[in-house]
Amino acid sequence: MVVVDKEIKKGQYYLVNGNVVRVTYVNGFDVYYLILKLHKRMICDRAVFSSVAKEIKLHG
């Protein structure tokens, strides 16, 4: 089965379960991210992350 997900890149910000997170590393299966408020590092399956995370667009 092939899962088509959104493009996830290192350094992007997302909203996950009400928390702002920054992606620190991405590979074919997992997404590594940092919960900014809690300073906690997490790992999530890429397909699951893709379905629960909402990208935050930063305007500079």
From Swiss-Prot:
Protein name: Uncharacterized 7.0 kDa protein in Gp55-nrdG intergenic region
Species in which this protein is naturally found: Enterobacteria phage T4
